[in-house]
Curated annotation (Swiss-Prot):
This is Small ribosomal subunit protein bS6. Keywords: Ribonucleoprotein, Ribosomal protein, RNA-binding, rRNA-binding. Belongs to the bacterial ribosomal protein bS6 family. It holds the Pfam family Ribosomal_S6. One of its GO terms (biological process) is translation. One of its GO terms (cellular component) is cytosolic small ribosomal subunit. The lineage of its organism: Bacteria, Pseudomonadati, Pseudomonadota, Alphaproteobacteria, Hyphomicrobiales. The keyword Protein biosynthesis does not apply. NCBIfam families: S6 (TIGR00166). It comes from the Bacteria.
Amino acid sequence: MALYEHVFLARQDISAQQVDALVEQYKGVIEANGGKVGRIENWGLKSLTYRIKKNRKAHYALMDIDAPAAAVQEMERQMRISEDVLRYMTIAVEKHEEGPSAMMQKRDRDDRPREGGRGPREGGFGDRDRGPRPPREGGFGDREDRPRRPREDRV
């Protein structure tokens, strides 16, 4: 049997419980065809880079699969039929990653407070008015210093 990583996107208007039900449904398809599903990750609702079938967001889910090719083909066939699945991608891998995926590690990183984030700054000019601007080069400081241009309708 071959090893696969499978990611699919589900519509934004279904609930997280319905996404879990989809994962269980496709897990059942794999197991019915002689395969095993290892790690399952639900990455949650994320914004899409571009609209897919009129959706701006989607629920992302990842499954590590150890199954024959026929089982994966059957799962993909059922995903093509389902209206709840926007996109899917299956990749053959040499071995499954241990621990959380890169997306889950990124989520853990994003949960921590950042040191260099935008916040109130000490010192500098961000906390007070900088005062009047210095005169511009050429002798004109503000709009009142400019010579009036003749208007064509006054002639």
